[in-house]
Amino acid sequence: MKTIEVDDELYSYIASHTKHIGESASDILRRMLKFSATTQPTASAVKGTPAAQPVAEAKPVNPVKDKVRAMRELLLSDEYAEQKKAVNRFMLILTTLYSLDHHAFAEATESLHGRTRVYFAADEQTLLKNGNQTKPKHVPGTPYWVITNTNTGRKCSMIEHIMQSMQFPAELIEKVCGTI
């Protein structure tokens, strides 16, 4: 892996072509350029022209920046933009947060509940015990179920709690909550 620098506009353009959560920039570019791993680059360099040098060697990925990037990519993705209902955006955000750090997500959801309601559980029945009208839904890609009959403000506060617990920057939390 090599690291290259791109400007914000180009980064946003590439990120907007994300097909699924967790897709790497290399995968996106390969798809956009119709370049497969088996395709060999053609050597059409003019003699006397120096070959391009790599910008920098790949460095260990900073997990904090990586999770921030993943959330930004989600917000820029076509899949997220196509969601017409707040509950569907809510579910996509939860799936992404879980995929970024299972343990931190688990800790955040354990401490998240209302006066009389449990918001997250490992099964539908636990949520239904706290009210038949909770409309539990399974969070895709996770072992969790979540109640969904809350208003958008409550969904935002649930996301805010989880993201704060997972130590996301306040600006990103605000941006994510503003899109639900």
From Swiss-Prot:
Gene Ontology MF, one: sequence-specific DNA binding
Subcellular location per the Swiss-Prot or TrEMBL entry: Cytoplasm
Alphabetized SUPFAM superfamilies for the sequence: Replication modulator SeqA, C-terminal DNA-binding domain, Ribbon-helix-helix
Gene Ontology cellular component terms for the protein in this record: cytoplasm
ATP-binding as UniProt keyword: no
Principal location class: cytoplasm
Entry similarity comment: Belongs to the SeqA family.
NCBIfam families per the UniProt record, alphabetical: PRK11187.1
Known role: Negative regulator of replication initiation, which contributes to regulation of DNA replication and ensures that replication initiation occurs exactly once per chromosome per cell cycle. Binds to pairs of hemimethylated GATC sequences in the oriC region, thus preventing assembly of replication proteins and re-initiation at newly replicated origins. Repression is relieved when the region becomes fully methylated.
Protein name: Negative modulator of initiation of replication
Taxonomic source organism: Salmonella typhimurium (strain LT2 / SGSC1412 / ATCC 700720)
Origin organism lineage: Bacteria, Pseudomonadati, Pseudomonadota, Gammaproteobacteria, Enterobacterales
